[in-house]
Amino acid sequence: MLLEHLLIILWMQLTWVSGQQLNQSPQSMFIQEGEDVSMNCTSSSIFNTWLWYKQEPGEGPVLLIALYKAGELTSNGRLTAQFGITRKDSFLNISASIPSDVGIYFCAGQ
């Protein structure tokens, strides 16, 4: 019998460019184990680098994926991130979510 776990993935905003605003969506989500998850960051400014982090309770942020080129698509296990062609957005996808995916996810542009 397969147990389904309710996962809560929360994320917040982080930007490294003074005065720049990043918009992330969704702000929070509830998903079932095994579901795919998509998150995105957008900005009115152009960035040369997009970074995705995860922070678990009681821990510091950990870099998951760094993107350096417009249009770049990078995978790391079940994680896939893309740097938008316009250099104003980035997307993070988690396939087949598992309970250890619960955490706070940050995007950063610089």
Curated annotation (Swiss-Prot):
Write out the entry's keywords from A to Z. Answer: Adaptive immunity, Cell membrane, Disulfide bond, Glycoprotein, Immunity, Immunoglobulin domain, Membrane, Receptor, Signal, T cell receptor
Q: Which GO terms describe its biological process?
A: adaptive immune response; response to bacterium
**Domain Ig-like, chain residue ranges per copy:** 20-110
Q: Which residues form a coiled coil?
A: none
Q: Where are glycans found on this sequence? A: 40, 93
Record-annotated disulphide pairs = 41-107
Q: Which domain of life is it from?
A: Eukaryota
Q: Does the keyword Aminoacyl-tRNA synthetase apply?
A: no
Pfam families, per database record: V-set
> PANTHER family attached here?
IG-LIKE DOMAIN-CONTAINING PROTEIN, T CELL RECEPTOR ALPHA VARIABLE 39
Subunit and partners? Alpha-beta TR is a heterodimer composed of an alpha and beta chain; disulfide-linked. The alpha-beta TR is associated with the transmembrane signaling CD3 coreceptor proteins to form the TR-CD3 (TcR or TCR). The assembly of alpha-beta TR heterodimers with CD3 occurs in the endoplasmic reticulum where a single alpha-beta TR heterodimer associates with one CD3D-CD3E heterodimer, one CD3G-CD3E heterodimer and one CD247 homodimer forming a stable octameric structure. CD3D-CD3E and CD3G-CD3E heterodimers preferentially associate with TR alpha and TR beta chains, respectively.
**What is this protein's record name?**
T cell receptor alpha variable 35
Q: Which organism is it from?
A: Homo sapiens
Traced from the root, the source organism's taxonomic lineage reads:
Eukaryota, Metazoa, Chordata, Craniata, Vertebrata
Gene from which the chain derives? TRAV35
